[in-house]
């Protein structure tokens, strides 16, 4: 059974912010379809670390309107197991992506991302397709 809640990766927010035509972005389309979405504390960090002071309000307002899922003990255990598996297969992905994937897996949520090349290496992760 597919979850109605979708977890959004950093790439979804960056794409929305960079594009002039907001309607062409997945974030806009999901909101327009009234899809429920969340994100992770890792994604929030990645977005906010690159934001200017002028952009901070926009991002804080947006993140305040959705559930931000934390990286906790359970997600740490999941991330460690995935890391070991990917390392043994010589298919390591970036640590932030690994942490984001572990949180989505923990909460049994599909992950919406524009970075499928990295995330598809994590077999346990369900990727969202529109």
Summary of predicted features, one role per range:
Residues 1-5, 101, 105-130:
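Acidic, PIN/NYN-like endoribonuclease modules and their adjacent C-terminal/linker elements
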Residues 1-39, 48-64:
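Short, well-structured N-terminal submotif of metal-dependent ribonuclease cores
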Residues 12-13, 43, 75, 99-100, ...:
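Alpha-helix capping/helix-boundary segments
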Residues 24, 44, 56-59, 76-79, ...:
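A general structural signal for well-ordered alpha-helical segments in protein cores
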Residues 45, 67-88:
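Acidic catalytic patch
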Residues 90-93:
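Donor nucleotide-sugar recognition loop
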């Amino acid at each position: 059974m597919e979850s109605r809640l979708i977890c959004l990766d950093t790439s979804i927010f960056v794409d929305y912010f960079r594009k002039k035509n907001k309607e062409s972005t997945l974030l806009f389309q999901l909101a327009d379809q009234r899809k429920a979405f969340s994100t992770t504390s890792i994604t929030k960090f990645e977005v906010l670390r690159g934001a200017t002071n002028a952009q901070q309000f926009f991002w804080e307002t947006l993140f305040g309107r959705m559930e931000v899922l934390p990286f906790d003990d359970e997600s740490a255990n999941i991330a460690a197991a995935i890391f070991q598996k990917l390392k043994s297969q010589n298919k390591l992905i970036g640590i932030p992506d690994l942490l984001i994937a572990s949180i989505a897996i923990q909460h049994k949520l599909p992950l919406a991302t524009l970075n499928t090349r990295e995330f598809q290496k994590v077999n346990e992760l369900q990727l969202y397709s529109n």
